[in-house]
Amino acid sequence: MSPHDAVAHAHTSTTTSPVAVSHPLDALTAAEITAGRAILEAAELVTETTRFPNVLPIEPEREAVAGFREGDPIERRLLFVLLDTATGRSAEAIVSVTAGEVVDHRELNTAEAPYGQPQYLFEEYARAEEIAKA
């Protein structure tokens, strides 16, 4: 699957229209994010309780950007932070939407130093307010 293909999202009947990426440092498109999620789903890394606190572009090497010429192929990789809201487990996955594959996946150990966890989800703000006021 190419990031420029139209992708049907599994939870809706909407099909995205791809926006052409013309430079390695272009912002992520909705089609790329949707394609990345589809790749993670195909790799069985997403459940109904999985949320994505962060989806970030992985910038290409400086040399690739400096040597880029219009029309050159563009490798697009995304870093997804996955949070299972049912279990609290967290992971990071690097997805190549160009190659249509998960390049790397690792569980995050939030119980050992250097302690950390994914950022708050928007859905958690109201819940945090309720807890604080209780």
Task: List PLM regions with ranges.
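Intrinsically disordered, low-structural-confidence terminal and linker regions
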Residues: 1-32
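Short intrinsically disordered, low-complexity segments
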Residues: 10-16, 40, 59, 79, ...
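Residue-identity detector for threonine
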Residues: 12-16, 29, 34, 47-50, ...
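Interaction-mediating elements
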Residues: 17-24, 35, 39, 73-77, ...
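Short, non-transmembrane alpha-helical segments in secretory-pathway proteins
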Residues: 24-66, 122-134
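Exposed beta-strand-loop-beta-strand "reactive/processing" segments of non-cytosolic proteins
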Residues: 47-98
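Long, charged/polar, surface-exposed segments that mediate recognition or autoinhibition
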Residues: 103-134
